Amino acid sequence: MADRWRTEIDALLADDVSALERQVLADYEITDAELAEARDAYARCMSDRGLEADFGDGDGFSYGATQESQDAFRSASADPEAALDQIPTIADACADGTIWDIGLYYHEMRSNPEGRSLLELWRECLESAGVDEIHDLTDQELQELVDDESYVPPPEVGTCVS
């Protein structure tokens, strides 16, 4: 396990986490069965609030409510627009203690087992894609470029940051 993941999980466990999170994260590994358990807990919470859970593309990190259940939730409300505004808050509240951190680390530890920073991953991808303009940039300069909303990157960047 990368030091980064151990350090981040230690910090998380030192904070106030749910019993499920403590159980799943204690050994610094998240199995498929543990992710399924976290998803089930999230789905129960959403169902208790009248929404059906949706996990997007199944990457372990995406969560929300199905469009059908959002439509039904809005239709059942006296104020459909207010109900629509409540859905992200409900989804986040249900994710807290269930899928939020467990899903994040499940995804991150598999897609980036070395625990490299996003900036390191971008630099490596951009350099291998032949994007010359970033070659001599410091990490700070690259971060500023990535954060600059007026910057129009070359097409190769899409493969790195999508």
Task: Identify the residue ranges that each predicted region occupies.
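Mitochondrial intermembrane space
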Residues: 1-162
